[in-house]
Amino acid sequence: GLFWLKEGENTIGGAESNDFVFPHAEASLGKVILKNNQVFYNNEVIYSSDDKFSVISQQSLRWFIIKRGDKFAIRLRDLEGEYLKAFHGIDHFPADSKWKIKAKFIPTVGKKVTIIDITGRSYQEDSPGLLEFQVDGKTYRLEAGPGETKEDFFVVFGDATNKTSTYGGGRFLDTKGFNPDGTVTLDFNKAYNPPCAFTPFATCPLPTKENKLTLAIPAGEKNAGHH
């Protein structure tokens, strides 16, 4: 589940009288309080920044706070949920060295791009540079987002397979460092589905216009087929 918090008190629990109804939960689980960009539960801070948050466990439920732009939400997971029970793995395209490509990194210092997520919300994100590569003699570019380190990048991309064999909202790809010649390896064999391929309660970023490629990339994960 995904529940957007309002400023102040937000009641949670299994009863319909709560602001947010949790499945298989006690009638009342208390109040989640949003105040001054911090979130409190049972008089304790459970969120103060993206790297300082708590995961609350209550029977089969696990929940925590996420922030998207200036909005806060409860992300709820049920370890006994139907989505997990129905999950039977993900199909992949056969690995193909054609789709392990060296890309030229073109820095774009100070550039910000507008990201729209699957819920329709938008926010600004730093774009450290462009990744330029060739396939069958044609040149393509992808806007790179920040990765785990300053030399890693995170890419959200779409391609022509989104209409057939891969998830319609695009896929994710991580890069790891620079090659000795200064290039960056794009290994599309490692392209993977975003969380929103599996659940309607995710807030995945969608590919920017620049990152909607016209070519088909039959590599990496196929559509999970569960959502």
Language-model segments: which ranges?
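Forkhead-associated
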Residues: 2-65
